[in-house]
Amino acid sequence: MSYLRTELHCHNLHSNDHLGDLEPPFDCDVSVQAQLEQSLKADLDVLFVTNHNTLDGYKQMLEYKRNHEKFSSLKVYPAEEVTTDKEAHVLVYGISEEIKSNQTLDEILDAARSQGAVTVAPHPFSLIDALREDSLKCDLFEVFNSSNIDIFSNKKAEIFAKEHHLDVIAG
């Protein structure tokens, strides 16, 4: 069996100004080029660009890759971090069209599944933008998020995942 070194939850500067109404407009200052360079440096095989409420950044990354051979070995797939009407977030992998934000969680999940996408509950117990128990509606569950500002959020996610026998990822 072989393993793929994969980044499942990351943003670039195209995520800016696409966040929810109650969130600050600035999310990330990493350019597409810098993100690709960092991915090569980390020896990644796969990258899912999960910008907030947009596929921008993914599209630009594909274009940049086409013009720069050194990134050809890195596989890049479409994804989006969608904001619900309650300002919680859902990761959606493998979509071809953006999913509209500010919908209910169930509406977002239906839209994702209509595209054959996989859904993930990111940072499910963070202090803000978390799905909490509604995470059970998603396909996968993020037990570690490097951006959580407290150590308890990841630990609580890990315990919750074990109690509910969830399939987990780290982002």
Language model segments and positions:
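An N-terminally biased module of ancient metal coordination in phosphate/nucleic-acid-related enzymes
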Residues: 1-86
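Domain-core and long-helix interface of multi-subunit machines
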Residues: 6, 10-26, 58, 94-171
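Active-site segment of extracytoplasmic enzymes that catalyze sulfate/phosphate-ester chemistry
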Residues: 88-91
